[in-house]
Amino acid sequence: MKLSFHGQSTIYFEANGKKVIVDPFITGNELSDLNAEDVEVDYIVLTHGHGDHFGDTVEIAKKNNATVVGLAEVADYLSTSQGVENVHPMNIGGKWEFEFGSVKYVQAFHSSSLTNEDGIPVYLGASTGLILEVDGKTIYHCGDTGLFSDMKLIADRHPVDICFVPIGDNFTMGIEDASYAINEFIQPKISVPIHYDTFPYIEQNPEDFKKLVNKGEVQILKPGEEVKFD
């Protein structure tokens, strides 16, 4: 499996001959190394509806005839309002086996909406994290979230190999809460900090996060770099 980070909360992986992107915020993201027009994927998986996660979903889905996996409200919005033909609705607690591996939606503490063409926020259900089981690895993408103790329950049920954890503060956990989550609750083999430096509100030094983490390895990735694992 190839697993790479592409700025903000975007990750990309290839498994079982399928290409998957999570939270494809590319256009308007100065830290992204991707061009939305060039992205070729079979699946798009979304944690929630905010623009810095929903991003280029519609364009990429239509261009590739890709299946978009998201909460029921997100899937309904895409199919009824945006003309996306292939959607797979899910909800928190649910798991589904796809061609590339499985997706399970877990809770996150955050909000979820998208501003439409008229400037009106559209409610898009809950915000979530993801448990991805791919090629024998368990990946926990925390999405956008504050600190909560049931992260331990999630990790107890699904021992985590690789965790993508937000550290930006202001909108999500900051460095202290994120490192606490890793050390006390999730305890993954590898932690990758995400959701920082994209905007002035979330400027952080990931090395400060790395210094506080004492469980597992921390890999600080530049956009386009791959996670290194056995």
Swiss-Prot record:
Database matches in Pfam families: Lactamase_B_2
Disulfide bonds: none
InterPro entries: Metallo-B-lactamas, RibonucZ/Hydroxyglut_hydro, UPF0173, UPF0173_UPF0282_UlaG_hydrolase
Domain of life: Bacteria
SUPFAM superfamilies associated with the record: Metallo-hydrolase/oxidoreductase
Cell membrane as UniProt keyword: no
Keyword Signal: no
A GO molecular-function descriptor: hydrolase activity
Residues passing through the membrane, by range: none
Keyword field: Hydrolase
Family: Belongs to the UPF0173 family.
Name assigned to this protein: UPF0173 metal-dependent hydrolase Sca_1312
